[in-house]
């Protein structure tokens, strides 16, 4: 019996060490907040003339409680309150204010300073909660659901949008959410070439599958250890 317990403890320790190793790999290689690369400063990101990947995590220009178009921002920017936020910094539209509702509308904006030679770029958006319009260089590039509060219709989906750009490019995302657990943009958008953005999407899917398989393995192992312990006690 002591030998069985010894082997069981060694197996538990091995599974625990494996779990810690997997979580560390997720933190090291799938953490968009700690990934290398330039970040925006006060809503402006300088994109070098290379094929690098940019995780748009920091200092988005954010207009709370309102849906704006690029034209409205251009013409009346001084009339609207804005602040700089990081993606995922807050779990809702309340911006950490406990007296406000976590639901509502908001507009995110970032300016890209691109190389002078025109290139094709892609921006990957993961599950924005729960309806939005994406504008690039003043044009409506895509829409999920309907963020208009009076005609609200949610639609949550991973999407990739491509565009040609050089010089200066403006990204505007107008978002509305009425009842999700987390509101607004909670997952870091990624900017790169279309090929790299799609590779990253594929890797993220693979990591999710591996994580689910590992979780299932731990569950089966826990049931096995429970049944084995019951037999030993009997």
Give the predicted meaning of each segment:
Residues 112-137, 171-173:
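Aromatic-lined ligand-binding clefts that engage carbohydrates, nucleic acids, or primary amines
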Residues 198-234:
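Core alpha-helical transmembrane segments of integral membrane proteins
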Residues 55, 105-111, 120-122, 158-160, ...:
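Intrinsic-disorder/low-complexity, polar/charged segments enriched in Ser/Thr/Lys/Arg/Asp/Glu/Gln
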Residues 77-88, 139-158:
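Solvent-exposed beta-strand/loop surfaces of large extracellular or lumenal domains
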Residues 153-213:
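An acidic-aromatic loop/edge-strand motif
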Residues 117-119, 138, 156-158, 162:
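Beta-strand-enriched, solvent-exposed domains that form extended recognition/catalytic surfaces
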Residues 2-117:
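Extended carbohydrate-recognition surfaces in non-catalytic/accessory domains of CAZymes
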